A protein has these predicted regions:
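Short loop/turn segments immediately following the C-termini of beta-strands
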Residues: 52, 97-99, 149-153
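Structural motif
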Residues: 55-56, 101-110, 154-159
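Beta-propeller domains
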Residues: 48-72
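Blade-loop segments of beta-propeller domains
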Residues: 64-99
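Beta-strand-rich domains and repeat architectures in extracellular enzymes and scaffolds
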Residues: 27-53
Length: 182
């Protein structure tokens, strides 16, 4: 019994020591070119890329498998720009707005089907939140929320409930980042 305990203890200690060194060195294994330069998201099978006006889907070998060249079609508010994206539970969440002269209007989180990149619904922006632009977006899987960042005023992150689409709150960032993207 003591011998088994000692072997298990050594194994656990060795695993703990090994775990501390994991991730210490990264090597680029390959590169493949993609269209788009606004945002990228990945699930276990695909990469999703946003251009300013197009959504793309690539397999893990870098082959283009889907493209939506009309991502603003059907949106409840006029838009001309896709920014950052995230993917969760078979849906792509995209920060979308009408962006002109450094100002965003009609901010929304457009939700697309990850299979065929078609628009499903939008989460409306809450103007009283103080947000004036959307530069970054992330799905908070633990809290079932989507968070947006603002390039013009980077002091806050703005959170919306995924279940209801309603604005929940903003979080003050300290120290304040400036001109963050994606």
């Amino acid at each position: 019994m003591k011998r088994t305990f000692f072997v298990l203890l050594l194994l656990a200690a060795g695993t703990a020591l090994r775990a501390q060194t994991l991730g210490g060195e990264y090597r680029l294994s390959r590169v493949f070119p993609v269209e788009g330069r606004q945002g990228i998201a990945a699930d276990s099978n695909y990469y999703y890329v946003s251009g300013s006006t197009v959504l793309y889907k690539y397999d893990k070998q870098g082959r283009l498998v889907a493209r939506n060249g009309q991502p603003f079609e059907g949106l409840p508010l006029a838009a001309n720009h896709i920014g950052d994206i995230d993917v969760w539970n078979g849906e792509i969440y995209a920060g979308i707005e009408t962006f002109e002269d450094g100002k965003g209007e009609n901010i929304q989180v457009a939700v697309y089907d990850a299979d065929d990149l078609t628009w499903k619904r939008s989460i409306d922006w809450e103007p009283s939140s103080g947000q004036v632009e959307v530069c970054g977006l992330a799905v908070d899987r633990d809290r079932n929320m989507v968070w947006m960042a603002d390039w013009v005023d980077g002091r806050y992150l703005y959170g919306y409930a995924l279940a209801t689409g309603k604005y929940v709150r903003k979080v003050h960032l300290r120290p304040v980042p400036q001109w963050q993207q994606g």
